[in-house]
Amino acid sequence: MAIRDKLAQLAARLHDAPQYNSQGAVLFVDLEHRATLKKYLPLEVMRNFLGGRGANMWLLYNLLDEERAALDPEVPLIFGTGILTSSMPSATRGNFTSMSPESDAILDANGGDYFPSFLRTHGYDHIVLYGQAPSWTLLKLAYENIEFVDAAPYVGMDNLALPKAIERDFQCVEREDMALARITTAGENQVLCAGIMGGIKAIWARGGGGAKMGSLKLKGIMVHGTPRELQPVEPMARYNKVIGKKIIGTSVIKNALKMVGTPFLYKPSRVLCALGTKNHQETSWKESLDADNFDPYRPGMDGCYLCPVHCRNQNDMTPDSQGGWGAAALKGLTGNASYDKAQASVEHGKQRNYNGILNDGKYDQYDKGDGPEYVTLGKFGPLIGIAEPEQVLRLNNILNDLGLDSASTGSSIAWAMELYQRGIITQKDTGGLDLSWGNYEAIEKLLFMTAKREGFGDTIADSARAVERGKYPAAALDYRMTVKGLFQSDPHDARILKAFALGLSVATRGMDHLRNRVTLEINARINDDPAFKTALYNGVVSAAPNSYEGKEYAVRKCENNYAVGDSVGMCRFNTKLFNSPTLPDTGDFAVQLSSLTGQAFVEAEMDEIGRNISGIEHMLNFRLGLRAKDDTLPRRWFEEALTEGPFAGEKIDRKEFEAMKARFYTVTGLNSEGLPATDWHEKLSRLITGFSLRVELPRPLPGAPEQIVVIDETVGDVTALRQALLRKLPEAAAELNDKSWNVAVNGAMVLSGELTARVSSGDRITLVPIIAGG
């Protein structure tokens, strides 16, 4: 069904006015016809899925035609702000959601800076984009005014140049009276690892959102005008102070994130020997990339809209800069190196020695910027064999300008480097590039080639799909570090960390730690009291990072917390369990949601809402063809043991892993194919589409281990039902096309007139084999 037809059906279920206090509108934007429609989501969507990520999934489920390619303009790109975005400390974020062109799963990228808060204060909670614009377009929003602006003058501009041009042409200043979500040349060229930029460093990175936005010929979304404050009611304002104190009073925030940012994570990972190195062939790297080695180049910190933390470390290697912000901030913090406490006091005394990247005294725009985050430090340090802080900083700044996801881009380059090392590809394939580990000159050049899809950059631009697109031989898949077709999001090697590994395997957007990372495993010796862990995770969880026992409870609890956090707009860094067990939790979110929306929430139901959000994501991925077999890990982690560190010899045991995964499915409420079990599935279907048919099968079929299929698309007769069954279970087509299987509706056999036999939501359908006899 065409998206405009799907939208017409959906619009009939939506409202013309807000359904609760502070609700913003959903703006549907038909880029092809330059038309818009403004509606409001039903109250039950907020009650069961919140906003942001959760409500995005509700919209995507109703509008997606999974039989189309991800870059088809009929597949929508959806942005959603959290319900508490701009109204609570550190709630600054929103999600871009679609079907991923980069992976086999959903696209769902979370980001902050100023765009989500500006959008929400201008009266919009969600934007649904579809159709390809007739020419490159800038969507300009200013409260009720919506304009489709010719973006031809901005085509070819990257992240540093574009906002300057917008500021000039519209006489505005980014982060003061303008916010801009935009793509770079990488997005224009549909580079699969291109993100959507929201600031000098802020990026909606994962899953290929930049390519998806480029497929719509949309250069950017501009929110123009000073944001109106969404004035919190008095109880909310008072409790915001409690939340702010929780955040700022937490040790990891106060001593690490506010002072040096996420690079503090490099040392504990290095000491544990859980640091992906040379495409995970090794697991430890140089001390030269410990966070204190960046001190001389750190002039200060920046942050998102009204956030009290300011965790974004800035960098400046130019001659007149003043570094030293946060110098020695981590010294003596034993929690930062719990497996080798002496390392906590090690300072390297790094001095400024940068004289331009060619050591010729020449500097350019890439010698200063924002970042790096730990992800970029790991992906463009140990993963590709780079050991110099200055080289990492410069690569970080180039990535930010080019709008490339550092996780996927770094992993794609590391994959290519290992293939080059093994002789699977040669300089004939790379266009003469020497892809030896640590070859900085080749790596910098390759980034620009990737954004333009030039030469071997065209291969890197295809990210994890390079084999599928004919760029590498099938043998290359043995060395691809992906789950569900998405490269790993962070630099950790999880062969030691069993909960971490489980989380990466079941994460709904692919191999991504931000869905459910059990961070306390990394520094397990800080919080290893069994009773504490049991209370924290609602189940008995082993304190040993390399144990499989109880880790399903830890992943389940983290997944619920983070899904709720995304859907209210809270930064992951400041959400309980990601960095600390003392940070704001779902109980705090419930208090503020109740105050802001006028709807009563309690902590217990927030946990269930988190489960609902992951449940709808599992349902979406099932529609995209993913099954339990896709909840797995790269071959290397099962077959190759660690060779160094306190856990040398560790790897993932397949039997133990599968048992742990099965337990996770059970505590989550999934069946053995990773799909919500029948009763929960029916409940979710009614909440999402307003339609649910339970079809009982004569026996278990591929994809239907419970002998039941839940149909959640509206069908009116038995023929339409049979077609829906085939769409739901294409792997069982032979059985479902068996004409000897009759249909019974509410116990009554349909013997003739099948084309006109009516079915309705809630009916009980049974497929009954004909019994032959004579």
Predicted regions and their residues:
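Short, well-ordered alpha-helical segments
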Residues: 109, 113, 117, 160, ...
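Basic, polar low-complexity surface loops/patches
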Residues: 1-300, 401
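Generic structural marker for isolated residues within well-ordered, non-membrane alpha-helices
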Residues: 163, 209, 590, 661, ...
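A generic secondary-structure signal marking the coil-to-beta-strand transition
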Residues: 25, 75-77, 179, 303, ...
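Ubiquitin-like/PB1-type beta-grasp interaction modules and other compact soluble beta-rich domains
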Residues: 689-773
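Short, surface-exposed, low-complexity cationic segments
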Residues: 48, 683-686, 764
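Extended C-terminal regions of large enzymes
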Residues: 30, 92-95, 170, 176-180, ...
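A short acidic Gly-Thr/Ser loop motif
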Residues: 215, 773-774
